[in-house]
Amino acid sequence: MEQPFTHSGTRDPAPSPREQENAALARQAAAAGIVLLKNRGVLPLNPGAPVALFGAGAGRTVKGGTGSGDVNNRASVSIWQDLKGAKAALYVISRIAGEGKDRRLEPGDYYLSDAERADLQTLDESGLPVVLLLNAGGPVELTGLLDGMQHLDAILQLSQLGQQGGQAVADVLLGRAVPEGKLTATWARRYDDIPCARAFGSLKGDVSQDTYRDGVYVGYRYFDSFGVRPLFAFGFGLSYTTFALRAAGLDVQPGHLAVQVEVANTGARFAGREVAQVYLSAPQGELPRERRRLAGFAKTRRLAPGETQTLTLEIPQKQLAAFHPEQNAWVVDAGLYGVWVGNSSDALRLCAMLEVDAAVTLERTHPICPPQHPIGELGAAPGAQDREADQWRQKVEYDLPVYKFVPVAPAAPAPAAPLLAEGDLDSLVPLL
């Protein structure tokens, strides 16, 4: 009998309607994910402006990850392919990253190569505006460039854009799409500003064990709590227009919190979308707590100049909780919580206070893999108590509202992990 399933793809040389629809969606999604890190008015480009294209990444565009992150597609559009007719001036830097292709702390990867630095220096000396495109799945060290280049007028973080990446880049550069992406990681000024910078075994010549001591201070929560200024903050991303955000109200009920954020397009030329972000700060007590924690976010519809939209962000009560290891429980501690609104982790405004009178346990856990020895995690950030007191000062100065918040404990305890009934960890390992 003939085997019907012998080929995983298509043998038809012509793209199907489904492929064409998916390609259009991929182009739209890629453009929406591009992050504008800097713009001194050079973007969007005039399609008729005589400019130049540099950088090996222009023709060797990285579409995605490696290993399990790789996908097979019919064809990919490079940045060069879709811009050679538009006369765009760019310098493109590409980096491969993915499963089995971890980034390296060396020139040509996390750091710029000597050739890239020389190219950019030559462009800077020409006096022409320089537009830098970063086709990389994570940060590239740029502190020296930003400090030393006079004509680095725009930076776009493309990440890995998929098969329609070239078209998406052209859409953003030429103003057919307006940037609306936000950074999902903090970009440090120096690599060693990252608390786990030296934890990776590949840097120590021993990949058998990595010890992470960040504790609750992972990513932006470390930079924010310890007062380390990043190059680009978590949640950051510019637009071709400007937005104003303000807290429009809070709905506080037992076990429920909702924050209304009004977003207005204050620009005069471009329609665009903005992401409203709500963060919570917690009382500093017996446990180390981050200065602020992202609790919710939402994106507006496409707002025309002068248009306003009010978003409602539902905040689960667990966002107020901290994990108490000695209790194996998530607990909302008694004390004062701050509600912050903004559009990145370093551009926030305190808009209200929540006061919890008594601690409430929301969830109990059952450890399967308890630590075998102390890890020595980071302790409380210096000045944490002072920052908490500063919230009260802001409350008085700005007459901020204070809401009583009553956490609601679940009616029944969380079920035990079913594997625990089989024995201890050592006896379970062969089963995993």
Residue ranges and their predicted role:
Residues 1-432:
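C-terminal non-catalytic regions of proteins with extracellular/luminal or membrane-system context
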